[in-house]
Amino acid sequence: MKQSARAKDYIQNKFKGYTAEYYLYPDRGGSFGNVTLSRLPVDGKGKIKFEESANLAIYTDHNVGDRRFRVYNCHFESYNISLTGVIRAIARRDSTVMAETGTKMKRSITRRPEQVDQVFEDIENCPVESFVCGDFNDNPMSYTYFRMTRGRKDAFVEAGDGFGATYSLLWPMLRIDYVLYPERYRAISHDIPRVPYSDHYPVITEIEL
């Protein structure tokens, strides 16, 4: 609890001027979870917890003039494997590590579509327009992407350039972080700064409402 409290205090002090909505819990000596920061007032909020998983999605409701919309902030199941560790295991012919890796990948491949369907059902029942963003841990050829882009545009496709890779450890191969928005709007810009804050690069998008 103390770790979560410290994380919440840090967020509130670091991002003054923003409304911060978050769901955090202690993990590995720190805190893990989702955070949504907004300069707009938050008129409603909620979370979608995934069964037997540390991952989740949160959402916030906002008003801009006479328009009301919801923003989903998603973090879907990852493979939870170390690429360096896998490479070393292959080099050593370590069957135990390879078997563990296979188990983790199978678990992720099974869980992620279930999580996606859970969020999609919530989106379908949402009474207002919805924007969807976050770490999908899946590529643009996946079921995850196909499902989440239904009825929405991909900001990178509309306004980005290059490969659009967001995962730094396999740059420029993987684009697994997305900003999706209703089809009637337009993405003005899309940028992925290569900054060393995380193993993921930030995705910065400007959308004309």
Please annotate each region the language model reported.
Residues 96-107:
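Short glycine/proline- and acidic residue-enriched helix-loop micro-motifs
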Residues 1-64:
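Membrane-embedded segments
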Residues 2-6, 28-31, 54, 79, ...:
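Active-site environment of divalent metal-dependent phosphoester hydrolases
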Residues 113, 120-130, 136-209:
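Metal-dependent phosphoester-hydrolase catalytic domains
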Residues 38-43, 53-95, 185, 209:
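Beta-strand-turn-beta hairpins that frame and shape the catalytic cleft
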Residues 18-19, 67-69, 126-129:
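Loop/turn elements at helix/coil->beta-strand transitions in domains of secreted/extracellular proteins
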Residues 2-5, 106-114, 170:
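Soluble non-cytosolic domains of exported or imported proteins
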Residues 6, 10, 32, 111-114, ...:
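Extracytoplasmic/secreted proteins, especially bacterial periplasmic and envelope-associated proteins
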